[in-house]
A protein has these predicted regions:
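Intrinsically disordered, low-complexity terminal tails
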Residues: 1-77
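Assembly/oligomerization interface modules of large self-assembling protein complexes
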Residues: 68-157
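Short helix/loop capping segments that flank catalytic or ligand/cofactor-binding pockets
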Residues: 129-130, 171, 254-256
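Internal, hydrophobic cores of structured domains that mediate oligomerization or house catalytic pockets
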Residues: 130-160, 165-166, 182, 186, ...
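Alpha-helical scaffold segments that mediate packing/assembly in large oligomeric complexes
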Residues: 158-237
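Short, aliphatic-rich beta-strand segments
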Residues: 159-163, 246-248, 339-342
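Extended, solvent-exposed, turn-rich assembly/linker loops in the middle of proteins
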Residues: 204-277
Length: 363
């Protein structure tokens, strides 16, 4: 039997969640955890109890509820802001390029954030993180993690939708979700532009991405990316690996030319070795691994030369978002029946490790 039902739902739960750096969904789940195999989290169980259907199942002749379902009771009204927030966040985080660039999302209760960094530029600190042998009487070296000098500022991403209360309440939730998804996709696309800027220039804490020129990696480089330059660039990520690459159209085409060269004697030999002779090679260090190639037209040239961004996804970008920033305007809309519904999220981005990303310029 459920521990938490609609009768327990009050507006104060949003403030309670906010004070604990939690979303309402997180708080509800902590109060009433899902049992193994239930398939629904605490918020979804409350939606089910309220009789609010968000999806149409045509083959069973079941249709999604209308937005009006959130107006039926005071408890249903409380569910609406979190429903909008969940739908928006899902659309943003599932946007393909965004999903591959962000390592983690961290909730905070403010619109500014001071991140912690392991200072690799400090020689003593860099030596301290090396797990080298020490004598029995010697102290272990201390690696220091410190707060960044510059705070990360959060910005609002989203849209304000002008629509009458009457028009929206009669819209099916399935169609309403499509509108929110469109807004979420556009917001995620705007976030990607900011992420790429943080990768390239840093977040204000002296952590711009190291840059490498193709000609310094391969003396035979002239204009087009070479296999030697590409592999040497990937090896710069040692001891980790470059698992994600972002480039514009020209950069992406040059990478594909290296990965899938035109039919030549060399490529035929590669094919024979791989198939005819049944010989394979492994690189267990994951330095040259399966790489996700991402296209983005916002990758600008650097010094007039094409730039290719490489990163280890787990070590590069953290998104910080303000808990409750998606909530207040949706709450005003349904309570006051206003004509402007603001669907947005306050968030910012910071660099986890300076060398988590590197840039290759084709020069």
């Amino acid at each position: 039997m459920a521990k938490f039902t609609l009768s327990n739902l009050t507006p104060d739960l949003y403030q309670q969640a906010h004070s604990q750096d939690m979303t309402l969904s997180m708080l509800l789940e902590s109060l009433d955890p899902a049992t193994e195999g239930s398939g629904l989290d605490a918020f979804e169980r409350l939606m089910k109890e309220a009789g609010i259907l968000t999806k149409t199942v045509r083959d069973k002749n079941i249709f999604s509820s209308k937005v009006d379902a959130f107006y039926r009771t005071n408890e249903n009204k409380i569910l609406f802001p979190e429903y909008v927030a969940r739908t928006l966040v899902q659309a943003m985080t599932e946007f393909p390029i965004f999903n591959y660039l962000v390592a983690t999302r961290t909730p905070i209760d403010s619109n500014v954030y001071k991140a912690s960094y392991l200072d690799w530029d400090d020689t003593d600190n860099k030596k301290a993180v090396e797990m080298r042998r020490v004598t029995e009487a010697a102290d272990l070296p201390i690696a220091r993690i410190k707060l960044g000098d510059t705070a990360i500022t959060l910005y609002k991403y989203g849209r304000a939708v002008e629509a009458s209360y009457e028009a929206l309440r009669r819209m099916s939730l399935e169609l309403f979700e499509r509108h929110i998804n469109r807004i979420g996709t556009e917001a995620a696309n705007n976030k990607v532009s900011e992420i790429l800027t943080v990768i390239k220039d840093g977040d204000g804490n002296s952590n711009a991405a190291p840059k490498h020129k193709a000609k310094d990696l391969d003396s035979s480089f002239s204009a087009a990316l070479t296999k030697t330059a590409w592999i040497k660039f990937l090896l710069k990520f040692y001891p980790y690996g470059c698992d994600t690459v972002v480039a514009n159209e020209d950069g992406l085409l040059q990478i594909l030319e290296v990965l899938y060269p035109a039919s030549t004697v060399a490529s035929k030999m590669d094919e024979l070795l791989a198939k005819g002779l049944n010989v394979s090679t492994t690189l267990p260090q994951d330095l040259v691994v399966n790489t996700t190639l991402l296209y983005n037209p916002d990758i600008d040239k650097i010094g007039g030369k094409e730039a290719i961004y490489g990163l280890n996804r787990s070590n590069t970008i953290e998104e910080i978002f303000e808990v409750g920033s998606t909530i207040s305007e949706a709450d005003k809309f349904i309570r006051n029946q206003t004509q402007i519904l603001t669907i947005s999220e306050n968030s910012g981005f910071r660099k986890i490790f300076k060398d988590g990303a590197r840039i290759l310029t084709l020069e």
